[in-house]
UniProtKB/Swiss-Prot annotation:
Oligomeric and partner information: Heterotrimer of XdhA, XdhB and XdhC.
Annotated metabolic or biological route of this protein: Purine metabolism; hypoxanthine degradation; urate from hypoxanthine: step 1/2
Cofactor annotation: [2Fe-2S] cluster
Described function: Iron-sulfur subunit of the xanthine dehydrogenase complex.
Domain 2Fe-2S ferredoxin-type residue range list: 7-82
Entry GO MF terms: 2 iron, 2 sulfur cluster binding; metal ion binding; oxidoreductase activity
InterPro entries the record matches: 2Fe-2S-bd, 2Fe-2S-bd_dom_sf, 2Fe-2S_ferredoxin-like_sf, 2Fe-2S_ferredoxin-type, Beta-grasp_dom_sf, Diverse_Oxidoreductases
Organism of origin: Escherichia coli (strain K12)
Keywords: 2Fe-2S, Iron, Iron-sulfur, Metal-binding, Purine metabolism, Purine salvage
Stored Pfam families: Fer2, Fer2_2
Full protein name: Putative xanthine dehydrogenase iron-sulfur-binding subunit XdhC
GO biological process: hypoxanthine catabolic process; purine ribonucleoside salvage
Bound cofactor: record note: Binds 2 [2Fe-2S] clusters.
Binding residues for [2Fe-2S] cluster: 44, 49, 52
Amino acid sequence: MNHSETITIECTINGMPFQLHAAPGTPLSELLREQGLLSVKQGCCVGECGACTVLVDGTAIDSCLYLAAWAEGKEIRTLEGEAKGGKLSHVQQAYAKSGAVQCGFCTPGLIMATTAMLAKPREKPLTITEIRRGLAGNLCRCTGYQMIVNTVLDCEKTK
């Protein structure tokens, strides 16, 4: 394969249709950042930190491990797509109000993971164990996670 080859990817990003071009091995995180979506952080680049978490068809994924080519025909949501009409989403508001995070590097990934977790249909409220499991792929070096878990609990109570 010629390394200068590109593929065309048609997808929806934050509700807008896109036709993008990328090399076949390009990670989705890189492609999204090239579109100016800087909430998609490039942390570890090996799926360990969760800073690059986005939603693909409603499922939280590590976009550093997800090839851009796989986004063909998919609905992608980043933190930038969560606010509507200049108003923060319910989850964004909860994180801002609680002060659950400190430096902010992990915040976009945590918000997207929380959004996906809360969107899943359930018969019972999430338990603390389920929340911790749901956020396990998102590292935060500044906190002990309890305020983050409490924020998710608050989000669920008020949704």
